[in-house]
Amino acid sequence: MPSKKLNPPIILLGNVRSGTSMIQGFFDLSDEVCTWFEPRTVWTYAAPGRRHDRFTRDDATPRVKRYIRNRILKYQLEHGGQRVMEKTPSNIMRVPYINEIFPESRLIYLVRNPLSQMSSSEFRWQNVLNKNQFMIRLRETPKTQLHYYAWRLLHDNFRKRVLRKKHVSIWGVRYPGIYEDKKRFTIEELIAKQWVEASKTCSADLDEIERTSPGAVYRIRYEDFIMDPAKHFAEMCGHVGLGVEQGILDEVAKQADTSSQDKWKRLDPEVIMRIKPIVEDEMSVNGYEFPTEMPSEEERREILSRERLTSGGQGSTIRN
């Protein structure tokens, strides 16, 4: 019979389209872990109507802590006592809040080059929540808070299906002020600002945690991870106190996707140069260099051709 004691959840922090789904899939290979796909409405229990994702320690009241810890424990017990692993992207703006609720959890932080992230993100701005995702979200949401999320879903469906808007109202991390920025930025510029604000906020919050708890955070860049995925995944597991068998590491090495390294080269060079002043400084902080040469038309055609074979879709950041 599984223990009714809450095991420290494994919390992976990372922006949208940064590789967190891949790494969550690797944790799912372990018999000791059950993964929970982005239980956003559980995390926002403190303030479901807030128009941004920034939550602090002050939001983690005793009632909120009790509710969220009980929800994680319930999921753990429903899965035979396995440790719960989750990777809700908006939690990148909630590090102090999460640390207050789960001080026993050691954190993992994944960051990715914003140009590569943008090439994946813009297409998602064009999609509303599908029926299956909606039903899952509905089951996860506290019954007293359903109306907050129903309104957002109806609003985005109305924009897409009735007004024929290309993009949903907001997709991805909502930093404070994003709705004002949306009025003056292009979608590509807004995605760039999302990356910058999330990176700055999360890094500062993690620095604060490490000042009092050295070694509490494992930080890795996506680009470094895929160069030696088995090694870095073993380090992640060790960081959170999870054993890992060689067979799992072999599978990680086999499954890691290294094909997306040059995906940013499909972006329109005009878009790349437009977001340069937004992202360049924060890229440098994370060890990235802004490209000095733009992709050639031949490179872009090759990447687009390859992607059409695998996905059949493209976003407005791409120019034929």
What are these regions (language model features)?
Residues 1-79, 128, 137-149, 255, ...:
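PAPS-dependent sulfotransferase catalytic core
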Residues 1-10, 133, 147-320:
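PAPS-dependent sulfotransferases, especially Golgi type II membrane carbohydrate sulfotransferases
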Residues 21-24, 43-45, 92-95, 115-120, ...:
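Short catalytic/ligand-binding loop motif for oxyanion handling, primarily in non-cytosolic enzymes
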Residues 46-50, 98, 119-124, 129-133, ...:
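Short aromatic-enriched loop/helix-cap "lid" or pocket-rim segments at secondary-structure transitions
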Residues 72-94:
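Glycine-rich phosphate-binding loop used to anchor ATP phosphates in small-molecule kinases
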Residues 87, 98-124, 236:
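Conserved phosphate-donor/acceptor-positioning beta-strand/loop module used by diverse small-molecule
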